[in-house]
Swiss-Prot record:
GO terms for biological process: proteolysis involved in protein catabolic process. Pfam families: Proteasome (PF00227). This is Proteasome subunit beta type-1. Keywords: Cytoplasm, Nucleus, Proteasome. The lineage of its organism: Eukaryota, Discoba, Euglenozoa, Kinetoplastea, Metakinetoplastina.
Amino acid sequence: MIEDFSEHHVGEANTLQHHGYPRKLGNSVLTLPLRQGAKGHPQHWSPYTDNGGTIAAIAGSNYVVLGADTRLNGDFCIHTRSDTSKLFKLTDRIFLASSGMQADRLQLQQMLKYRIQWYQYNNGGKVPSTKAIAKLTSTMLYQRRFFPYYTFNMIVGIDEKGAGVCYSYDPVGSTEPFRYGTCGSASSFVEPLLDCLLTRQHMVTQAPADLTMEEALGMLKNAFTGAAERDIFTGDTVCFHIITADGVGTEMFELRKD
């Protein structure tokens, strides 16, 4: 019986080996093929993400009204409804306004802050002009042109003559001063409205004269209200900064929450 049992299992082992299985399994290692992506759907990774939000500004003869919503998005989620990091105070009369990726936005803000502090340290506490800070921002963005900050920026403030000025940038630092500007997820809704109300370059009727501070603030409130109705990445609250030669005033304006 023992001989029959041994012969039976030896024959079975030979049969398994014949079909490609190893004779000994004690030291064998089980390996699985790597999982492949579905055909036609290659896997991509991006270092950037857009956290949404909209900024807009109108410059007048002696003021600038600057606004940004407080919604911080990620994909189709709302991370917070009280994000005020889109507006960053550089000096008493100059602000950096940014939308886009929050991490890059915060990095750019800190780098500009350190460069301005370094300038003041080397110049006896002298505050750089709005034009100088605008040029510095352009240079810093251009230095990162091969791996740019994923931010959409404006420098706004009061110039040496006491007039409001707004500098708008592309991702690699090209800029020029404008009377008004807007960036962010709802800029395609806000900018045509400001074009229509402020310059009327595409209309026969003459453009209005310089707005008062109250008129500019009301115009931006209407623009953000309309943007929140059309853009899901803009909403909750708008933080307005009214910048003059005497200082900065702040006003909060409620938008829809959904």
